[in-house]
């Protein structure tokens, strides 16, 4: 019998959305429980990451059974781009704006369990700010019954504005002498940036929120990978920043509860309401905890998705001929669509991206 390559094994593995949901949820819950045990934290302690994860999950899962039918009644259906994969056209009409229940469900337990920390409130506000920007975009799409929301320039200005105000608040709380000016790196290294840290922080917030937005293109993809990264950050920060770790795990639980309704075949999409908030929250956590390199590694999938779009657009423009048409590096960008058009099923792509994200999260401990 001929040996089977890794590529062939992945192509032959065809999980269901339900299998992916239960596998990811069980794995993240087990990892969070193990961290609690390692730190000798009881289940009902306010510092229990498993409690935060469970509460966020329960609230989002229950809320979804009420909100999803409501979104259907108000005809909050997704408009599918005609130039996208043809298999996605059957998703037209699936309710969007699912972030309106995933985000509050993930934030509420964090504020109850760790609300004494001003940083937790700041993280909650910046998450809600990006959710509001996303909601405005989603609402305009639904209102005009096409795939065009608010203008890209306005959207970007609002994202930069929210990032600037968040960083300004951090500076006001810490004072100019106490602000973060040095980035911690793996292997005990550090990089002194002085005040240049803050333009980098603003850029990180805007770019990460757009990166998660680009990743939100398949059932369960952004929600599952986002929950994994949030849980990974929570595990990383639990010993030194338990309040921020609680925020991470609570929001991770909210997205896992949302994933119950968003797994393939999706009953609801998170929309920009959820995807912009997800990226904004992850970036804000990395900024306040000064673990930008951890974000870069754990969220490597989001970076790859963004790079695939940048390369596709740049190459197309660079090779544009007299007829106005250029060449493409990928069949379609982002990367997940390239794999789809190459014959991969949605669940195969999602399973592979879950696995990649979990490997990247685990690799952080090797780099530390």
Curated annotation (Swiss-Prot):
InterPro entries with a match to the protein in the record: Glycosyl_transferase_4, PNAcMuramoyl-5peptid_Trfase, PNAcMuramoyl-5peptid_Trfase_CS
Any GO CC annotation of this UniProt entry: plasma membrane
Annotated disulfide bonds: none
Listed transmembrane segments: 50-70, 95-115, 117-137, 156-176, 183-203, 218-238, 242-262, 284-304, 347-367
Protein's UniProt keywords contain Flavoprotein: no
Keywords (A to Z) from UniProt: Cell cycle, Cell division, Cell inner membrane, Cell membrane, Cell shape, Cell wall biogenesis/degradation, Magnesium, Membrane, Metal-binding, Peptidoglycan synthesis, Transferase, Transmembrane, Transmembrane helix
Family note: Belongs to the glycosyltransferase 4 family. MraY subfamily.
Alphabetical list of PANTHER family matching this protein: PHOSPHO-N-ACETYLMURAMOYL-PENTAPEPTIDE-TRANSFERASE, PHOSPHO-N-ACETYLMURAMOYL-PENTAPEPTIDE-TRANSFERASE HOMOLOG
Annotated protein name in UniProt: Phospho-N-acetylmuramoyl-pentapeptide-transferase
Species of the source: Synechococcus sp. (strain ATCC 27144 / PCC 6301 / SAUG 1402/1) (Anacystis nidulans)
Gene transcribed to yield this protein: mraY
